[in-house]
Each structure stands twice: as structure tokens, then as C-alpha cells.
Amino acid sequence: MEQNYTKIDHELPLIPLRGLAIFPYMILNFDIGREISLKALDQAMMDEELIFLTSQKEAEVDEPGEEDFYHVGTICKVKQMIKLPGDTVRVLVEGVSRGRVKKIEQEDGYFRAVIEEIVFDSDNLDSETEVEIEAFVRNVFDAFEEYINIGNRVSPEILISLADIEDVDRFIDTIAANIYLKSSQKQEILEEFDIRKRLELIYSILLEEIDILKIEKKITLRVKKQMNKVQKEYYLREQLKAIQKELGEEEDINSEADEYREKLKKIKAPKTTKEKIEKEIDKFSKISSMSPDVSVSRNYLDTIFSLPWNKETKDKLDITKAKDILDEDHYGLEKVKERILEYLAIRTLAKSLKGPIICLVGPPGTGKTSIVKSIARALNRKFVRISLGGVRDEAEIRGHRRTYVGSIPGRIINGVKEAQTKNPVFLFDEIDKMAADYKGDPASAMLEVLDPEQNKDFVDHYLEIPFDLSKILFVTTANSLGNIPRPLLDRMEVIEVSGYIEEEKLNIAKKYLLPKQIKEHALKENFIKIDDETLRSIINHYTREAGVRTLERTIGKICRKVAKKYVEDPTLEEVVINKSDLETYLGKDMFKYQLAEVNPQIGLVNGLAWTEVGGVTLEVEVNVLKGKGEIVLTGKLGDVMKESAKTGISYIRSIVDKFDIDPEFYKTNDIHIHIPEGAVPKDGPSAGITMALAVISALTKRPVPGNIAMTGEITLRGRVLAVGGVKEKLLAAHRAGITKVLIPKECEADLDEIPENVKEKMEFVLVEHMDEVLEQALLKSGENNEN
């Protein structure tokens, strides 16, 4: 029945409203703050004070496009405009008539549209339709009257003015403006241009609202009957308040309790949790304000309501941007970055995915802690760091029970409270440094925290109610897995963060450390210039580490001296530091890189070892002396290493015939095995083949090439078994100038971790038996190393 409407075109400014809708003849005031709306309002005031108002589909959109708002709205006249503080304007408008957007364009920073004004024309109705509409109008009027009588929400006086309205469209709009409507219902009424359907729509909404009001009334009556006891309690509480006031007790416990009850309504928590909190509030309301228990109860409730029960940050699921952020902050660490990007990809597909629990293991200074900060930034999550180094008390994790004086929640709950979100990135730093004592074992408490199946109902001893930790992304760091209990390690996905090679350190120094230190020392960008050769010299002669922490401090030392020089001479434009200048800035070389012996040696073999700060080369020296068959082991060797040496000698006794060794050598000779740097403790089985080869070399007087190193455990039958830390050991061999390394065949997969530029400069020989080691490394007497 759109033919019963007159249509007139207007060109008007358009304002999209957020969460509001206006009907013709309705007066409404609202605040405008967006620039696009302010410009449209200014234009309307310059024209005929007419403006077109329509509703946004989604109120959250700050910069709407044409597709973000409805195309049917209301032409309005601006009645009043008041400027408020902070670039906000309060506007009073009156609806004139409905309109529909025919054409829209955005010019000069606001929307301008051709609006088709649509006005109902009752003259075109036939007599039958008029009768039907009149019947509808009466039904709607009666329903609206019943709505007013039941609800007591609208003044009955409106019925008088409604009875005088002859325009059916205005009749509908007036009712719509005075009843409770959802946003979708308001828009549906605005967009309906069939007068009969429009009457049907408002009538059905009124009947539905009447049914709801009747049910509300029943509920209200039922509740009032149950209120007698509550009113009695309220009366007694009011009397108690008066008594407390007379006694000078100013704190109004009950008003605080009421505030807590209001807060309880707003949190999203399981029913049992809310019931427990409600009991605590009731208990709090009955405590005298003079009682010492009141502060304990208040602190507990404040802690509960300060937790982010409902708050959660929205993840940025843009893999490309996340990769850019991770690459921007860190060089290398590809395994860690790849795992986070995989998690992001799966989160994009499965929104309910639980966060992985990752353990980053590697030497100090390799970027484990800082990469976790970058992970939080890439995911758009809050970051919380908890250091577990030296933690001995289980209560540090789970909190103290409230029976103790001064009890507080554990570090987990405090971290969540600090983050004010249910899904931060949580870093447990130095998880391998926890220890147990008589107060409990914190590692056992961590079992629940780091178990995705259990941590959704984590119970802190202080709170004594479950709190969901399942949406947190937990990352732990450690220098060694050896000190982490097996059940705890089993819950984590271990990613090894290896030490950096020289080339990686060079890139990190150039791209990250030097610019960072220049900025921290308030120097101009590129004020200090250090070439690659000089940086390599700093790396090799002033630091000895798997990470880059000492390297950063060393560069910082240079920056301090340059800053002093600049203050003394402000005319300096830049400072260029060459290799020859290092002694001036840093002093004499701190480390002389002990490159491998060039010439073959008898009884001297290069071994490889792994430490918590990375791989190192280890010289094994053997002397065979006339004696009584004693085996002397020096160099502060551990029990496993001593047993490994004895295993090697037993193996040698089984092969004396192959090398023309005196079968009684172990009776007539003392064998002295020494590993230099005697103050440093050494242990483990990985020097087994190294010690065995050194003893054979000393017994046979056959040299071993100085450019060869090796690692591997030996058995009594001469088999070579796998060892750990292969990547770190091979990088240490590369730093020492070794060109050939023997490793167990079982460790072949570890070669995939070795950078290509290292592989190009070194030869890796995979061995399964000691025979292969002897063939590769034992020269004939007087033979020189051909390599």
C-alpha cells in the first residue's frame, strides 16, 4: 500500500545515530561528538535546520560507511543546540516525517543524501480499507490503554492527545515512541510502508508487551509476599545502624555490603561461586565495624571483585602482522616464532582453542624472556612476568589460607589481577630454579596451573573459590631441563633456544643492540659507527657467551665513553670506532680465543661439552707413566665422567691386539687423564670416546689431528651412543676453528639445526663404533695432518 504515501525529494545532511532511533513528531535530545556528525549538524544549521537521522546497524563502528547504517530514518528539525566541554554538542530535535535514502555521497567530511520524504495520504483509501483501518486503530488504542494501566510506565494523559490524532501514521508513531521497543522493532516499524501491516505490527508488539507486563506483575506480587522477613531484617539493620552511629562507629558496613551485592550481580561466575561470595558478603554485613575481622573480610571481598571475571582482550589474528612484530623485535629464534604463528593460525580456525604451554630452554641472554613480551604484543594481549628463581614456598604459587595473619593471594591470582584480563600472556621465568623445602614444593603447585584440563578450575588457597586460567597463554623459561621435575616437564611443550653463532651475534649487534644503546645514552641516531670487523672483534675478544647479554653491556660501555667525549666536545658530528680503537674503549682483550692446535698431538684430543651458558671445547690430555696400574683422573671430574673413563680403558684392554699394545699396560703403567681448567666442575658421559681416543693415542704414540673434535658416549663393546646439546657443541667447535667433528650416528637429526654457513666450513662424520673414530682420527706415527 505504498501508493497511499506522498513522496517528496530533499537533499539533506545525514547523521548516523548509535543506539538511538527517532519517530516523526517525537522530541529527542542526544549528544554528538564524532567529527562526521558535527560537520553534518553545522551544515543543517546553515540550511533550513533540517537533518536526516538514521540508526547505525552496529553501535561499535566509529567511522561508518554507507553500508553501516539503515537507509530508512526520520527527517528532523533541529530545535536547539548547546556546546558542551570537550568538543561535544547536545542537540534537541523534533521528528518531522519518515524518509528513505535514494542517493548518498560523502563530501567535506560528512554524509549528504537525497532523501525521499514519505507522508501518508488517507484521501487515496477506498471505503473498505478505511473501515478495516479504523477497526485496527480501535484495537491498537485499546491495547495501548491496557499497556498503560498494567505497566504504569506512561502517563495516561497521552491517551487524550492520542484520541485526537486523525493521521493513522502519526497515531502509530506516537505509540511507538512511548512503549518499550528493541532497536530491531523500532527499525521494522520505520521501514514498513503498508499502513495495514504497520498497524498489525504495532498491535502484535503491544499484545506481546502486555503479556510480559502481566507476568512481571505476578512475579512482583509473589516477591512482595516473601518480603516480610526481608523487611523485618532491614528494619533491624536500620536500628543497628542508628545504634552504631550513636556509638561513633562511622563506617556503614551494610552500605558496603550492598555495594558488594551490586558488584556480584555483574560478574560472570558459576552459581556455586556466586553463592559462596554471597555468604561472605552476608558474614561481612553482620560484623561490627569495630571488630578486627572487618578488615580481613573487606580485603577478601575487594580482592574477589578486583579480579577480571568478565574482561578478556581480543586477539589480533593477523599472522602477517604478528610475524612482522616478532621479526622486528628479535633476530633468529625461528622455532619460537613458528610455534606462535601456528597457534595464531589454529585460533583463527578454532576460537575455543586452549593456549599451549610452552617451555623455552636455552642459555642466558638468548632472548627467551624478551621474545615472550613480543608474543604478547603480537597477540594484542597483556603481559605478566613472574620470576620463579629461588621460590621455595608453595604459598607463593597458591596463596596463603585466610586463617593466617597477613594472608594474601598467590602470584598467579595477583598476576591476573594486575593484568585485568582473563587471557594475558603469562611468563614463568627461570622455572628450573624453583626449590622445595619444609614449607612445600612449588613445582607440585605448578602442576595444576600448567595443566589445561585442570587450570579452568584453579583454586587459590586465599580465595577458596575456582578461577578460570584456561584462556591464559603460559610460557616458561629455563636454562636446563635437568632440574625440572618430570611430571611438570611432561605438561609443557619444550622449544630449545640455542646459543647464537658469530654471524647471528653480528646481526643482532648491528640491528638491535647498537641502535638501542645509542638511544638509551641520549645520542643522535647513527652517531656511533662501528664496522663489521670491529664488532666481530668485540664478540670474539671481549665476550664469551652463548647469548648477547655481555655483548650488550660491552656496547653500552663504548656508548658511555662516547657520551663523555661528546659532553666534553659538543662539536663532534659522529664517532667512528675501528678495531684499533677497542683497547682505548674496552681495555686489553679479555679472551684469547683458543683455536685448536694446528699440529697433530699425542695424547691430546679435542672434546666438546655442553654447559648452561652454551657449548665449549674441552681438551683431554693423557700421560702414560711407568707405575703400578693406577688410573688418575684430575680436572674436577664428576662420577659419571670418571666411570666413562674407566669404561674406555676396559674397552682398550679388549682391543690391545689391534694396536700392538702391551696386554699388561694397565698393570705396569699409571694412566693420568686430565682436563684443563681444573676449578670448573665437569661431568657427563659425552667425553667417553674423547678420553678413550686420547688414551689409545698415548699408548700407541700415534698423534691425533688438532683440527678434529668429537663427542659421544662409549660402551664396553665400543659402541658410540647419542649425547645431548649437539648443536651447542658444534657451534663451540666452529668458534674454535675446528673443521672436522665426529658425532654419534644417532644424533644425525641434530645436524638439521646447524646454520648453513657453519655446515659449509665444517665436516661432520657420523660414527656408530669406536673403530670408525680410530679410523678417522688416529694418525700413524710420524704422520702429519693432511687437513
From Swiss-Prot:
Annotated compartments: Cytoplasm
Entry's family note: Belongs to the peptidase S16 family.
Matches recorded under PROSITE patterns: LON_N, LON_PROTEOLYTIC, LON_SER
Cell membrane as UniProt keyword: no
This enzyme's EC code(s): 3.4.21.53
Lineage: Bacteria, Bacillati, Bacillota, Clostridia, Peptostreptococcales
Top-level division of the source organism's lineage: Bacteria
Active site, per annotation: 686, 729
Lon proteolytic domain segment(s): 599-780
Gene source species: Clostridioides difficile (strain 630) (Peptoclostridium difficile)
Function: ATP-dependent serine protease that mediates the selective degradation of mutant and abnormal proteins as well as certain short-lived regulatory proteins. Required for cellular homeostasis and for survival from DNA damage and developmental changes induced by stress. Degrades polypeptides processively to yield small peptide fragments that are 5 to 10 amino acids long. Binds to DNA in a double-stranded, site-specific manner.
GO cellular component, one term: cytoplasm
Protein name according to UniProt: Lon protease
Domain named Lon N-terminal: residues: 12-210
Pfam families linked to this entry: AAA, Lon_C, Lon_lid, LON_substr_bdg
Keyword vocabulary terms for this entry: ATP-binding, Cytoplasm, Hydrolase, Nucleotide-binding, Protease, Serine protease, Stress response
MF GO annotations: ATP binding; ATP hydrolysis activity; ATP-dependent peptidase activity; sequence-specific DNA binding; serine-type endopeptidase activity
The keyword RNA-binding is annotated on this UniProt entry: no
Residues binding ATP: 362-369
Subunit comment: Homohexamer. Organized in a ring with a central cavity.
GO biological process per UniProt: cellular response to heat; protein quality control for misfolded or incompletely synthesized proteins
NCBIfam families with a match to the protein in the record: lon (TIGR00763), PRK10787.1 (NF008053)
Enzyme class, UniProt record, top EC level: hydrolase
Catalytic activity from the UniProt record: Hydrolysis of proteins in presence of ATP
CDD domains: RecA-like_Lon (cd19500)
Induction context: By heat shock.
